[in-house]
């Protein structure tokens, strides 16, 4: 197969019942996958960010019906009509960088933020759904920072991970990078999927001969949202990427910690007498706010709550969240 190594964990009724891991963490197969190996979970990070958002809603700090400019005045100069809920549900029309991807370090937070502040949306905010694959990081992340005062990753570390002993990080300390499993692109060099499925595979994973073919069969919105210029081939394994806080895509953690985190949410939002948030707030956050069709993801009818991907994402070809059942919530990701 194409996997060098992997891990899977399951919690049931508040108890860990499965924690499996195996294989290797690099292409040279010189390091075995261990219990504490960390993996970049990509867009699963959006659900973790969603937990942080839900927590500050729960605490009365954020009102999702207010305009973004109420909390972030600079954003309102070019986007005066955008509501907070538009950012949280991929309906802000800001799924790409109109002037091209900023040329900077992943740690240059303000550069990304100012680029988005200075542009107008592709569509009228609230009028359509278009998956904000990476721009979600700086749109939702900067909103969060303006409201709470901390970056999402710092808040998650202080208020969630440390409370429940979770080995999950948005912005990984450099002294922990040795535990990371590398993302391998060469494993896909000989991949020859059917034509219909090429468009569903992230461009950075495709061999060169299929990249141009893909660009001809996907929408302009997709190309804006998944602009390959944002990534160099080694970026996901770089110190810069792992240290940065990219709350749409670069969460690093263990399967066991993710299972525990969502296990807490699914069993009353409390563990060891420590309350994470109110169940009523979680229920509101995980109810459907938008159903698509999604202009970035091929017109798919993807259901979102407040950052969370929900059940009901089937298309004729692909279900973007195949393990999410009725009343379930989380997020799909390529990690």
Task: Label every PLM stretch briefly.
Residues 35, 40-44, 56-100, 117-118, ...:
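Active-site helix/loop module of the DD-peptidase/beta-lactamase fold
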């Amino acid at each position: 197969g194409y996997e060098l190594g992997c891990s899977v964990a399951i919690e049931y009724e508040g108890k860990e019942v499965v924690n499996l891991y195996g294989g290797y963490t690099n292409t040279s197969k010189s390091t075995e996958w261990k219990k504490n190996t960390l993996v970049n979970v990509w867009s699963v990070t959006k659900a973790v960010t969603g937990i942080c958002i839900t927590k500050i809603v729960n605490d009365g700090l954020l009102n999702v019906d207010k305009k973004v400019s109420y909390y972030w005045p600079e954003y309102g100069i070019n986007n005066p009509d955008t509501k907070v809920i538009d950012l949280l549900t991929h309906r802000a029309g800001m799924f790409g960088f109109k002037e091209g991807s900023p040329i900077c370090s992943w740690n240059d937070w303000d550069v990304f933020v100012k680029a988005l502040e200075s542009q107008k949306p592709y569509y009228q905010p609230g009028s359509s759904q278009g998956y904000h694959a990476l721009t979600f990081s700086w749109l939702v992340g900067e909103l969060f920072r303006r409201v709470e005062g901390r970056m999402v990753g710092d808040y998650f570390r202080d208020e969630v991970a440390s409370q429940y002993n979770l080995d999950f990080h948005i912005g990984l300390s450099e002294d922990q990078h040795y535990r990371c499993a590398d993302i391998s692109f060469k494993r896909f060099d000989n991949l020859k999927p059917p034509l219909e499925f090429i468009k569903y595979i992230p461009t950075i994973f495709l061999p060169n001969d299929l990249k141009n073919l893909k660009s001809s069969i996907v929408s302009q919105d997709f190309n804006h949202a998944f602009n390959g210029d944002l990534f160099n081939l080694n970026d996901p394994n770089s110190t810069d990427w792992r240290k940065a806080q990219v709350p749409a895509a670069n969460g690093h953690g263990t399967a066991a910690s993710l299972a525990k985190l969502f296990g807490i949410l699914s069993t009353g939002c409390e563990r060891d007498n420590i309350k994470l948030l109110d169940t009523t707030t979680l229920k509101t956050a995980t109810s459907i706010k938008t159903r698509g069709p999604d202009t970035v993801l091929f017109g798919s009818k993807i259901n979102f709550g407040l950052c969370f991907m929900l059940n009901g994402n089937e298309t004729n070809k692909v279900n973007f969240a195949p393990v999410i059942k009725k009343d379930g919530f989380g997020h799909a990701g390529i990690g």
